[in-house]
Amino acid sequence: MPILNVLISGPVQAQTTQQVAEMLANCTSQILHKKPELTSIAIRYIEPEHWIVGGQSLATQGKSSAYVEIKITDETNTRAEKAAYIQAVYEGLLKLMPNLHHESYIHVDDVRAGAYGYGGKTQEYRAHNP
């Protein structure tokens, strides 16, 4: 039941939104073993003039960038799975975004089961009340 928050540099593009969402959903399902029907992905766009890396805007550098944050229940994935996920997501972004800046971050956020949930129930509650 992960939720992903994604920032992409550039103008809003429905095709890019769909491609990035599909890539993230596939990586999340295949590598982190999360159920696609419980995966939510929110994608927002930021103009390159307003995204600063190393003191210069992406527009000035002629680069694109992305930031991907995924919240998952703590202790549900290994370090190796999370490392593989970060690698796969970065490689997926490289294929979809021209001139991707090296400093495009992917953050896997392990959230305590008692502090995270959906539908009004925590993951801890779900684990003990199937």
Where are these regions (language model features)?
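A domain-level signal for the structural core that forms small-molecule/cofactor-binding pockets
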Residues: 1-130
